Design a protein with these regions (language model features):
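Glycine-rich FAD pyrophosphate-binding loop
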Residues: 21-45
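Conserved Rossmann-like nucleotide-cofactor binding loop
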Residues: 12, 35, 255
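Internal hydrophobic alpha-helix adjacent to the cofactor/substrate pocket in enzyme cavities
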Residues: 414-433
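N-terminal Rossmann-like FAD-binding beta1-loop-alpha1 element of flavoenzymes
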Residues: 2-29
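Mid-domain catalytic core of redox enzymes
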Residues: 23, 222-358, 369, 383-392, ...
């Protein structure tokens, strides 16, 4: 039995605690927030328990299904036929299946063929190594053509990554395409999943498992320092207390690592500091009527300041329509400091443009959530920038969402990597970053 402290009670931290306890270790989890779950946590939205940031499940998420089975909540998995679309030149066009592609009037036949072929081949990939040093722009232009990139991709990347738009890894984008593109009922019908009761069902089951196995979760207990002596971890200072430990797993965003683990070498700290992140301001609206019939609407419109909307109620049934409008941007962007009211007004104005039948009275409630480190910036060659999970300080492992690369953030990757780091406790094993689709 190894006395272990896990820093962070998000999906990865809670999963790591669950697996570590199953392996017979003693576990304390320290979390700065007053609630567990991280990005998967719920909040009370005008009487509805809802995720702070939207989540959905794909059929490739095998680790999620295995974890739910272990926790006794596999029966809470639900599947629903969904669709995505594009807003182009003031109109909505269905997207994501062969018929929709053939009917799309904004592309010539050759561009349609090249796009369909590139997307199809991407869903059949088992490795993304050849895309590691290629940008998304280079990859799309080479496969689908410049016209396709300019029409369907340029604006989306610009609004999510801003000045870094031309510096986004093709491997990262391709794995996202594969994950969603293989979650289908048939060639003509996308099918995505949700957990009944939302992600809080899984979070609550993890918390119950941890407590049942004798683990302890300390909320509102921010970690101040990971302490070491003689090159070995000895504990964590958190919330004014010291938690002795023979092993520590840090799951907090990499920008915090240098401050949290000052005993790391300057070279190691520089490696964590070099990983850039962008923030998000996520607006959620509760409405009296639906905006569109689609789950996901990409917006490529120079006159709109949003890259898309997620009509979550078109996946998980809710009493009233629920729409997420995410604004991704670097935290030093001037707009990040704008008021909640301005984001609510702008985003609802966009919804009214998409569906002119929406009146001001149709907005029942709105909520604005912010994260400073929501999305790692995965540039070409990003894999070489990611430090090893096991550090030079014996007993200390460090991983956050960027370690899922080329996979994107998600519960399934959180659980997969959490199992790896938990199995490595008390050993010299270096956990693998290899994602579900291989590298």
């Amino acid at each position: 039995m190894v006395k272990t402290v896990i820093v962070g009670a998000g999906a990865m931290g809670l999963s790591a605690a669950h697996y570590a306890l199953r392996a017979g270790h003693e576990v304390d989890v320290v979390e700065a927030d007053s609630r567990p779950g991280g990005m998967a946590a719920h909040f009370d939205f005008d009487g509805l328990s809802l995720e702070r940031f939207y989540h959905f499940v794909c059929k490739a998420d095998a680790t999620t299904f295995a974890l739910m089975k272990e926790l006794g909540v596999a029966d809470k998995m639900r599947w629903r036929a969904t669709s995505m679309a594009y807003w182009v030149d003031g109109r909505i066009y269905r997207w994501g299946d062969p018929i929709a592609l053939l009917r799309f009037p904004k592309l010539d036949p050759l561009s349609k063929f090249r796009t369909g072929l590139q997307m199809f081949l991407t869903t059949r990939r088992t490795s993304f190594d050849d895309l590691e040093n290629v940008s998304t722009r280079q990859w799309i232009e080479a496969g689908s053509g410049r016209r396709v990139f300019d029409l369907l991709w340029r604006r989306l990347l610009a609004l999510k990554f801003h000045q870094y738009a031309d510096d986004v890894s093709a491997a990262w984008v391709a794995t996202r395409i594969k994950r969603v593109g293989t979650s289908r009922r048939s060639m003509f019908q996308e099918e995505l999943g949700y957990i009944e009761g939302g992600s809080d069902t899984l979070v609550a089951a993890l918390v119950a498992s941890i407590e049942r196995q004798g683990g302890r979760i300390h909320l509102a207990t921010p970690a101040q320092r990971i302490a070491s002596e003689g090159g070995r971890v000895v504990g964590v200072q958190a919330g004014g207390r010291f938690f002795p430990a023979e092993a520590v797993i840090s799951t907090v965003p990499t920008p915090y690592v240098s401050r949290l683990a000052p005993d790391l070498s300057e070279t190691a700290k520089a490696a964590y500091d070099s990983i850039r992140n962008i923030g998000v301001v996520c607006v959620v609206h509760k409405l009296t009527r639906s905006v569109t019939p689609h789950f996901w609407l990409n917006i490529v419109d120079e006159t709109m300041g949003i890259p898309g909307i997620v009509e979550f109620s078109n996946l998980r049934p809710t009493p009233e329509p629920i729409v997420y409008v995410p604004y991704y941007m670097p935290t030093d962007h001037a707009k990040f400091a704008a008021s909640d009211e301005s984001f609510v007004a702008e985003s609802f104005g966009c919804l009214q443009r998409i569906n002119p039948a929406l009146a001001d009275a149709d907005r029942l409630a709105s909520h604005v959530g912010r994260l400073r480190h929501a999305q790692p910036l995965c540039e070409p060659g990003f894999a070489a920038k990611i430090p090893p999970i096991r550090t030079a300080i014996a007993g200390l492992q460090i991983a956050d969402t960027c370690f899922y690369y080329p996979e994107d953030r998600g519960v399934s990757e959180s659980a997969r990597l959490a199992k790896e780091v938990a199995q490595a406790i008390g050993t010299d094993y270096q956990p693998r970053r290899r994602p579900a689709f291989g590298r």
